[in-house]
Amino acid sequence: MARRYLLEFEKPLVELEKQIEQIRELARDSEVDVSQQLLQLETLAARRREEIFNALTPAQKIQVARHPQRPSTLDFIQMFCDDWVELHGDRNCSDDKALIGGIARIEEKSVLVIGQQKGRDTKENVARNFGMAKPGGYRKALRLMNHADRFKLPIISFIDTPGAYAGLLAEEQGQGEAIAVNLREMFRLRVPIISTVIGEGGSGGALGIGVADRLLMFEHSVYTVASPEACASILWRDAGKAPDAAAALKITGSDLMALGIVDEVLSEPSGGNNWAPLKAGEVLKESLIRNLRELDSLSIRQLRDKRYEKFRQMGRFLEPSSLDEELIT
């Protein structure tokens, strides 16, 4: 069994995990019946894990969203997408591996799937540029979305990026323009679009494939205008204030539901999606099918009008509370 990567706030579970592994090894190496002891320890570990995850701060949710074993775009595709065929290239000069896309079927319904893809280890992350797409990635996504529009395929996008790549070459190649064009063109598409934040939803990098009729989000995912570290560095010149920035930015599913940004927050297994990826896949698949069914009942005009109106409603603001004022002073 692959060793679990535990986050700092999960360290109280380390000793229990060791005991559970020892008992499993004992059961494999002998005929001693340890099922009762194993059940007791697993129940205790599950209860403590649930207590920890029910009290996560926004800063801790970011750690969960960035967990190296959290299911990725390709993981979810393998879980519930049949006949997956990846499509490559922006038909200009690149094939960005940080943003993938292709045709698949979900419950006999043909769809276009696009999404950012991170790596599992350093080598994969370098190849995938840590999920940070360059201009070619967004142009590839737009090419595929236009393909979907032409053939009347609903679009499913999975968002998982710290942000669009901000390197010099990316800026020279028109990173801002590529994202801006995607925003404009996605409002014009005549097919249903469902976006899901499966991990990090960072800044314009997320928005580049995030103009959707329905925006879903896992409960331990985050969706933010800027990373808390960057925000703290800008506001206070101190990245150590990232937890304060995380609280002020309203990056969690519950906050974004209250603000009318997110349409649905998907529940995660106890401990996060990395503890039970298949269960997370079942939850996501059910929601996608349900939302696709609802959107299919709308005419093209209704679809585009509602999508436009949804984003026009964003940007409302509240007067800052005393706590917010303390955070920004």
Curated annotation (Swiss-Prot):
Pathways involved: Lipid metabolism; malonyl-CoA biosynthesis; malonyl-CoA from acetyl-CoA: step 1/1
Pfam families linked to this entry: ACCA
Gene3D superfamilies linked: 2-enoyl-CoA Hydratase, Chain A, domain 1 (3.90.226.10)
Organism: Prochlorococcus marinus (strain MIT 9211)
PANTHER family: ACETYL-COENZYME A CARBOXYLASE CARBOXYL TRANSFERASE SUBUNIT ALPHA, ACETYL-COENZYME A CARBOXYLASE CARBOXYL TRANSFERASE SUBUNIT ALPHA, CHLOROPLASTIC
Subunit structure comment from the entry: Acetyl-CoA carboxylase is a heterohexamer composed of biotin carboxyl carrier protein (AccB), biotin carboxylase (AccC) and two subunits each of ACCase subunit alpha (AccA) and ACCase subunit beta (AccD).
UniProt domain CoA carboxyltransferase C-terminal: residue ranges: 40-294
GO cellular component: acetyl-CoA carboxylase complex
Family: Belongs to the AccA family.
UniProt EC number: 2.1.3.15
GO molecular function, one term: carboxyl- or carbamoyltransferase activity
Protein name: Acetyl-coenzyme A carboxylase carboxyl transferase subunit alpha
